[in-house]
């Protein structure tokens, strides 16, 4: 079922992309969409304040308790996204996924196959 969702998404991107079919256009739009997604996260911190970044060096000890030690690693994010920031970030990440699928289409790659190779 998941492969159908991925394939349908990738096919709909291919069908709806009227401009920017050139690989250089796709790469620049993909990079721009990533920057916009990153900027939206930064705005959630600096403009809205619904989340806070509190990051520091995290020491990971590779010993027999390695898996337990992974639970001590934090994301460095405090708080929860407000509804507005969540909506903006979701929209920007969706746009980023659109151009990722477009890049896969241009290169003849299947997004679901890539997901499986990375996941498994």
Question: Language-model features: where?
Answer:
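Flexible "arm" and connector segments at domain edges
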Residues: 1-93, 97-120
